[in-house]
């Protein structure tokens, strides 16, 4: 049987544990579980050097080893006879393997605890089918994913074209991000996804669109370098993990820290939406000419949702979506400036919002906390940073003048908002603010009137106040 490493690409996803067998110089064998075997090239694989000190000592004495890997599509096990070649502590291979380990640890809140010491590269001397089903030998009940009726996202040209056609029909950032996530579900079968963009605060990403989650994630933040999303942004490389829950078992077992009450500054954050027990995660950096436009995150409760053959298509998809988002942001900024230059609303031309029935209108207590630059509505956190400053400016202007219509241009000209001079992403901030209000405080609405023009609509009375 002529079997190549390329034909076993699906075995190197880490879905089912592999087994590593080594032997000391005096003939004492040792067996250890491996979470992941990494494909290097047509003749080599790499094993992570982390915890298996006995295996490492044996290899130093006797460079021959045997590893058993399962095929997650068929359940067939394969024996790879190996010869140790070298250890790498830097370079693309080491970085790729270290990033996967760090992503799983960071997902558990244990970033920095699990470190890859080296990527040990082995030459594959022979490949033989295993007589024993490897999934049974490691105590894992195996369910093949192909041919079982489970959906598999195949990145065909037709699916990519369908998504591109959907994107071409959008005319705003809001419709674009919604079309992207809807297309990922309808064309590729990805039901749970979100898009994050860089926030005003350095080192932070903020969620502007989600799909498939019961909780509204608009405004949810991820710090760069933390969690899978943050690591994707930091490394600017895709992270694709299969069998995530199994990979997290060890990390959870090591986590004995107490869950102390969080300080107020941390409570004033919106948690990222997510599946309670994700089995697969995919994070894709959205890059344009070296600039991070955002991060696309996709989750699944299927252990083997993202396949090896999809890797190139995933990279291509990320580049296309990044260009689409950046072009839409530039398009909205330029067109709103040209439209707004024709007419800027005057105070006299715009009346305050009135309600046809004021008998049952509630009063909302809206408090702006200056130190944290955040807004609380009826003692519940709403939003912070630039979107909070924008909303506070709109509410105070309405309170003082009765105005309820505004333009993007006047916000850009308002120095008190402290918008960046270059690429302020104002449209993304307004989208975030609008969706956050829809979820947490529907009595306050920001309604688009025309490109670059919007209205503040109130279904409540406001009691505005500030806190240091």
Label each PLM-derived region with a short phrase.
Residues 270, 279-287:
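A short, aliphatic-rich beta-strand micro-motif
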Residues 380-414, 433:
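Short amphipathic alpha-helical recognition elements used for nucleic-acid or partner binding
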Residues 383-391, 419-440:
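DNA-recognition element of transcription regulators
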Residues 216, 276-279, 293, 299-316:
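Regulatory loop-to-helix N-cap segments in sensory/regulatory domains
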Residues 208, 215-274:
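Regulatory sensory and allosteric helical modules in signal-transduction proteins
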Residues 336-388, 392, 444-447, 451-455, ...:
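Short boundary/linker motifs that mark transitions into or out of structured domains
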Residues 170-208, 216-217, 328:
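Helix-loop-beta substructure at the N-terminus of cytosolic sensory domains
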Residues 27, 136-174, 207, 293:
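Signal-transmission linkers at sensory-effector interfaces
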